[in-house]
């Protein structure tokens, strides 16, 4: 009778500190936004949650690796919107791939950092992916909103508005800054909202 034994090695894979800068800082987690009609609303970002996602590796039915991959999550709401308006997750998978996933008003922007692969998907909610939406992503050194210059900004823009649901809450454009989160966005292709 043969007995297989193994020494299971546990590896921890953490999100790089530079990626953590995309989360909204605690002291900036409550802010106001306003549109071109001077309608203002409060934006509240909840505390950041951190957990370790378990994963395993096997060789000939014997467990050899026990990986724990760090996942960081943050979500938020605005005053006049029913449901979650904002949700950001960043996960380090096995130390080889960092995934940036941003749910914003019904659209999921996903970026594989190491490979530079980007996708945009229409969502029913933050867990339910729908059809792919034509979209661009560019990284800006800075972007000015209401006289304030924000640095390290992601700029998402939907390039085919006809491909998106007709719901007026869908974002057609989003500027998202490190440490601050959403600083400017356009909903339904008509209402432009800026951080105050």
Map each language-model feature to its residues:
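C-terminal motif of bacterial Sec signal peptides marking the signal peptidase cleavage site
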Residues: 3-6
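Conserved functional acidic sites
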Residues: 8-196
